[in-house]
Each structure stands twice: as C-alpha cells, then as structure tokens.
C-alpha cells in the first residue's frame, strides 16, 4: 500500500501516523507539505491530528484553504482513499469533503483518555477487519470533537450507512450527537474520525484495537 501523510504547521501526530503506516504496510509513507499542489500516485492519503495553524478561526478552517487541500479533493474525487484523524477530521469537514460540523466539547474541556467504539458499519474499506457491532478500545485527545449535523443531514448519514463508529458503553467524551465518532462520505472513500487508531496498534501501546482500520484498507487495496 502506497500512502501519504499530510504535514501542516501545528499538526503533531504526523510521526505517530507515519510509524503506524510503516509498521502495518511495510512501506514508509511519503510526506506532503501544505504548499504542494500535486500528490504522488498513492492508495491512501492521511491527514493526522494536532492543532493546525493553532486552531485559529476554527479548528481546521485555515488548513482547509491551503493549496494541498485542492489536490486532496481532486484525488478523493477519483476514488483515492482519504483518512482524517482528529484535526484531520476537522479539516475534512471544513473542506466540504465530509458532512456536519465539529464543535467545542460539551464539557468545554480538553479530553484525553481511552474510550470505547462500536463498529456501526463493518462493510467499509476501513472496517472490514472488524465485526459488525464489535466494541473496540481507542484513545482520544481533543478539545473540539463534538460532532453535530442538522436533522436532514443526520437522517441522511444515518440512512446511508455513513456513520462508521459510535462512542460505546457511555464513553462519549464530547457530547457528539447520536454518539457519532466517525463518518464517511457517500462514496465511501473518505473517512473522518476523532479517536486515534494509530496510537493503539501493538502490544507496546497496551493493545492493538486500532490496527484493524489500517489492515482493512491494506487488504482492500491489495485485493
């Protein structure tokens, strides 16, 4: 699997993501800087977490307007898989690649802890390694992860199977509507999620529940 990791000022989870992709796919990803307007031929583009541009204006608002984003939008339109984690999710929403909005946590506090996720849709290219309804562990670390969508949008994404993960067993850390933790686009090649699967992929992390997300994409691409 050929992958690419986007690097922007303020993102600080790029090294974690690079390490995860390298360990699982066996190939180190290429890195893409904010000013680049062309992206190499890759199977997966990842926008990692952090605080791009200091979260000024809104989380992800400035990053979504950088030159590299148009290149990502173009690749997504051609079916290339795109994953946004934490701030990456916020950027994808701001760029219009995913529906809804991400607001300040209902507690008005930064939350950093382990939560539980239910696999709501196990038929996506990112979740095939999991079972439908499976509950997995995953860490979160964010201040603005409260997912919201208006009634029409919510009905559409629920009806279309675009909700991929929900916070489970009462562990919703941010007040997200319907406990939504991850959504994808209608086409199914763009996924955004607040939890950090890259930080739970091996025994040294205390578990490997996040590994299935990357393994799923790898298996689909290799098929």
Swiss-Prot record:
GO cellular component: cytoplasm
CDD domains per record: GATase1_FGAR_AT (cd01740)
Positions in coiled-coil regions: none
GO BP term, example: 'de novo' IMP biosynthetic process
Pathways involved: Purine metabolism; IMP biosynthesis via de novo pathway; 5-amino-1-(5-phospho-D-ribosyl)imidazole from N(2)-formyl-N(1)-(5-phospho-D-ribosyl)glycinamide: step 1/2
Reactions listed under catalytic activity: N(2)-formyl-N(1)-(5-phospho-beta-D-ribosyl)glycinamide + L-glutamine + ATP + H2O = 2-formamido-N(1)-(5-O-phospho-beta-D-ribosyl)acetamidine + L-glutamate + ADP + phosphate + H(+); L-glutamine + H2O = L-glutamate + NH4(+)
Subcellular location field: Cytoplasm
Molecular function GO labels: ATP binding; glutaminase activity; phosphoribosylformylglycinamidine synthase activity
Pfam families to which the protein is assigned, alphabetical: GATase_5
Residues that span the membrane, as ranges: none
EC number annotated for this UniProt entry: 6.3.5.3, 3.5.1.2
Catalytic residues identified in the record: 86, 196, 198
Keyword list, A-Z: ATP-binding, Cytoplasm, Glutamine amidotransferase, Hydrolase, Ligase, Nucleotide-binding, Purine biosynthesis
Ranges of residues in domain Glutamine amidotransferase type-1: 3-223
NCBIfam families from the UniProt entry: FGAM_synth_I, PRK03619.1
Subunit structure and binding partners: Part of the FGAM synthase complex composed of 1 PurL, 1 PurQ and 2 PurS subunits.
Name this protein carries in UniProt: Phosphoribosylformylglycinamidine synthase subunit PurQ
Species this protein is from: Rhizobium johnstonii (strain DSM 114642 / LMG 32736 / 3841) (Rhizobium leguminosarum bv. viciae)
């Amino acid at each position: 699997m050929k992958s690419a990791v986007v690097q922007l000022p303020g993102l600080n989870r790029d090294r974690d993501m690079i390490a995860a992709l390298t360990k699982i796919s066996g190939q180190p990803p290429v890195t893409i800087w904010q000013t680049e307007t062309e992206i190499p031929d890759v199977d997966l583009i990842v926008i990692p977490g952090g605080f791009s541009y200091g979260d000024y204006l809104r989380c992800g608002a400035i990053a979504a307007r950088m030159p590299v984003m148009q290149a990502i939008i173009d690749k997504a339109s051609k079916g290339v898989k795109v994953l946004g984690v934490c701030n990456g999710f916020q950027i994808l929403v701001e760029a219009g690649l995913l529906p809804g909005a991400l607001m300040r946590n209902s507690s008005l506090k930064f939350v950093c802890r382990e939560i539980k996720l239910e696999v709501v849709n196990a038929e996506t290219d990112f979740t095939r390694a999991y079972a439908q309804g499976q509950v997995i562990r995953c860490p979160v670390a964010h201040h603005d992860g409260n997912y919201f969508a208006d009634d029409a949008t919510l009905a559409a994404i629920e009806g279309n199977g675009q909700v991929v993960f929900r916070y489970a067993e009462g562990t919703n850390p941010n007040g997200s509507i319907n406990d939504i933790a991850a959504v994808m686009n209608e086409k199914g090649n763009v996924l955004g999620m607040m939890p950090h699967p890259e930080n739970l992929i091996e025994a040294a992390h205390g578990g490997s529940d996040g590994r299935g997300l990357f393994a799923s994409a790898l298996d689909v691409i290799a098929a």
